[in-house]
């Protein structure tokens, strides 16, 4: 199933279909450094001469390769699980229906991104950041593929739906408060004296992506025009919805502590959002919405 459910484009990996011929189970276990534990198993069940199913599960647990020296958190770690159920129905000698569902879940500390002026350690796998990192991903895929040999051509119909839910907490300035002085970005507004990186974080940044696709293809079995023309006729439909939210915080009080709530009456934007950091109007929508909420709550 290409398109939405394929990774890459130049290289596509297609899983082996369930088989009605035999029962079999495969399993593997890998143990390595950084407390790596990787396990997977696949079992094929022939239900009848025309129906078969295959169930697969895999898990990976591994400590991170990188250490945050400020809070001791491991980064570049791994903690995920993948589950897949695959069914095939041989409707006739010339037609089949394949239905599968897949669930994938990630719950880890996240990827390491060292700040450009982070010189607290010469080891590239050691960094200093003052925000705890988190990454959570949940992906669900459901799809069906119908194939039929019509003699003169092969008919293929594909339908699928996919939902990806992503949540990330991260240190947005990539540095630890008052540890690193701005050297590499002279255009950065100096909020502190001396010019330290502003304490900033995303907590959280979320993305919900929902995609539905439908595809139909008719591919010739025999070339036309005396064997000179192979032809394909098809149509493709996709509906794609993305909902992103970013809750960003900056230490505007310059005291090394980020405030997660504005205590000023009616959340006056001139008090809570004094700086726009070079992007005029950056907080306009957020401040108006928050002002309305605070006014309603205190009335």
Predicted feature locations:
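Outer-membrane beta-barrel translocator/receptor signature
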Residues: 1-68, 73-83, 95, 140, ...
């Amino acid at each position: 199933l290409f398109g939405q459910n394929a990774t890459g484009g130049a290289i596509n990996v297609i899983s082996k279909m369930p088989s009605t011929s035999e029962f079999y189970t495969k399993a593997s276990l890998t143990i390595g450094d950084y407390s790596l534990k990787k396990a997977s198993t696949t079992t094929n069940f022939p239900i009848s001469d025309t129906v078969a199913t295959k169930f697969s599960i895999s898990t990976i647990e591994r400590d991170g390769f990188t250490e945050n020296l400020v809070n001791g958190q491991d980064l570049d770690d791994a903690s995920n699980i993948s589950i897949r159920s695959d069914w095939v129905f041989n409707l006739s000698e010339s037609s089949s229906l394949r239905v599968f569902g897949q669930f994938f879940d990630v719950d880890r500390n996240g990827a390491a991104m060292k700040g450009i002026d982070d010189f607290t350690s010469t080891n590239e796998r050691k960094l200093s950041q003052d925000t705890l990192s988190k990454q959570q991903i949940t992906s669900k895929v459901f799809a069906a593929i119908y194939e039929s040999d019509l003699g003169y051509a092969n008919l293929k119909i594909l339908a699928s739906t996919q939902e990806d839910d992503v949540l990330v907490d991260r240190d947005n300035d990539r540095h630890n408060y008052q540890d690193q002085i701005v050297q590499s970005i002279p255009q950065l507004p100096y909020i502190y004296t001396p010019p330290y990186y502003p304490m900033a974080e995303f907590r959280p940044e979320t993305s919900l992506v929902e995609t539905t696709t439908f595809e139909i293809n008719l591919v010739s079995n025999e070339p036309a025009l005396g064997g000179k023309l192979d032809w394909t006729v098809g149509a493709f439909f996709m509906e794609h919805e993305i909902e992103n939210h970013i809750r960003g915080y900056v230490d505007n009080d310059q005291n090394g502590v980020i405030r997660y709530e504005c205590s000023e009456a009616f959340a006056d934007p001139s008090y809570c959002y004094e700086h726009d950091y070079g992007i005029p109007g950056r907080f306009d929508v957020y401040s108006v919405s928050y002002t309305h909420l605070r006014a309603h709550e205190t009335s």
